[in-house]
Amino acid sequence: MATKKFRCKVCGHEGDKAPEKCPACQAPASEFEEIKEDTAPAKKGIDRNSNAYTIIYSAVMVILVAVGLAATSQALRPLQKQNEDNDKRQQILRSINVTVAANEAEAKYNELITDAFLIDENGQKVGDAAEAFAGEKAGYPVFVATVDGQTKYIMALNGAGLWGPLWGYISVNDDKNTVFGADFSHQGETPGLGSEIATPAFSQRFLGKKLFVDGVFKSIAIVKPGKSVEGQDYVDGISGGTITSQGVHKMLFDSLKSYEKFLTSNQ
């Protein structure tokens, strides 16, 4: 059993009992009070300097940030998809020599592109317009445009450059042989060198070139500036961008070869 303690309220003297007079200040016994000890355990606060607190705090913050980013991404996804689609429409339109702003791309695309479909290597249709534009289903997209009353066929190109993928679109007249226009894009080619394939100065070199010679598919060669090649049409490559130019050369042949049956059919 705990011993009682008493304290003088006048001078603070403590003792095991309340005397008639305080031995220190002579205050009467009425000035003594019993010292009450708090037996309840002290509540411990959070130790913000502990490793556990740091780990828990960091984990909570990471979760909150991740949730916030995910929510933002979901909210912005429709706008991102619209921007991606308009960029694709701009590329397709540039391949028929039509350049428009992003906010005008959808309207101009709907005006000029009269049909679209997917084909297989035999030139047979295997997908509709939506599938051709989405590019998610296996096959080769064809976009049919009407420009000044004349039919143009647009085909997709895919390849690899020095530092990353190359892609683009090339259009031909209704003879399915003569190039009407082209547009090329890249991811990461060297600025001022390989990146020049994305400029009109390069794509315009293809206008009027032929994909077939005497009925045989040849594609269009990319050669070093000043050089030539026999037996097929060719254009000058990019000075200082040899590997990128070779990538475009291979991309044209490999991609257009998949369209050969379509280009020689009566579709």
Per-segment meaning from a language model:
Residues G12, Q26:
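Cys/His-coordinated zinc-binding microdomains
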Residues K17-A18, A29-E34:
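Short, non-ligating residues that shape and space the ligands of small metal-coordination modules
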